[in-house]
From Swiss-Prot:
This is Ribosome-binding factor A. NCBIfam families: rbfA (TIGR00082). One of its GO terms (biological process) is maturation of SSU-rRNA. Monomer. Binds 30S ribosomal subunits, but not 50S ribosomal subunits or 70S ribosomes. The lineage of its organism: Bacteria, Pseudomonadati, Pseudomonadota, Alphaproteobacteria, Candidatus Pelagibacterales. InterPro entries: KH_dom-like_a/b (IPR015946), RbfA (IPR000238), RbfA_dom_sf (IPR023799). Keywords: Cytoplasm, Ribosome biogenesis. Gene3D superfamilies: 3.30.300.20.
Amino acid sequence: MADRIGKPVSQRQLRVGEMIRQSLGMIFARNEAKVPNLETNTITVTEVKMSQDLKIAKAYVLPLGGKDSELVIKKLKECSFLIRKALSKKIIMKYLPKILFAKDDSFEYAEKIENLIKQTNK
């Protein structure tokens, strides 16, 4: 796996990304961030990609059922400081990364590819 400029992702980036993904999953499952007007126990964190300097984490999330994903992403972005505060209690790092949230489209993409394969096999 390589990032946008072609440099390979380091083991440290992968390890820290996975640690943040697991911690975010626990935070959402237990509603530790206290995000208002959001059912956080239905959010799945599918992947976290770290920048090379480990100061930015891009978390790909998907609400259960995939509905209202734009609203969920908007609420998460608005309350990212609460989530980061809850994350700081779980992970000890010199610099806790800034968390950016994005919708995970990989399941929709995989379904689209499957449908194309089924159409060609007919």
